């Protein structure tokens, strides 16, 4: 599960400092404090523009993965919400809008629904097992007319309208999914950028646990930095902060850390 550790990198140049040993220790402590307090307070730099969303489910939300976690070839671009170990849970539209895309694949999302909202965002619901009747009817008609199962359907604007809280699909385990869950994304309408959904759903999630760091890495820039007389990287346990390291030049630091939430044994990436 090392791919769920997040390495928080901080760049600094200590070549001109008076006390190089103290500089590294104090810098690492600042990074650790930012990690802990950022996790406890829920610090986010993203501007939500005052948008509001309701919960996609009528039961308490628990996550199996969060936004930005490391994957073998990409960053995880949404929230994976647990569905109590089963498929078929009703999924509610998180805001008023219209169905802008219906996606059916063998892998990836499996079946996914895109709903465009007037507040500047589009919500994506992935790995669903089926859609609401009017959406399912539209999809089946398209599939029969084009004689294809796999498809990427784009209804006209406002052709299929939905209301906040309306059931739009049933949760599933379709596509590249390792177990029943809803993959929920938010994207900006103006440029398609992925947005972290977490700040919008904090009231539906219980999270009083701070991230836990386990390793610290020191990375000299080749030709520009040295740690303890060596150009090689040094990775040590978090308790090694009690030690002193001799360093010169330009150094990167990294922290391996995991985040946790209440009510579940899952661990998450930190960002």
Predicted ranges, named:
Residues 1, 8-9, 13, 18-51:
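Bacterial Sec-dependent N-terminal signal peptides
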Residues 3, 9, 13-14, 24, ...:
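Intrinsically disordered, low-complexity regions enriched in small/polar residues
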Residues 45-122, 129-131, 148-151, 155-158, ...:
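Surface-exposed, glycine-biased beta-strand/turn segments
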Residues 125-127, 135-138:
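Short, conserved acidic/polar surface loops in the N-terminal third of protein domains
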Residues 136-154:
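Intrinsically disordered, low-complexity Ser/Thr- and acidic-rich flexible linkers and loops
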Residues 179-186:
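Histidine-centered catalytic micro-motifs
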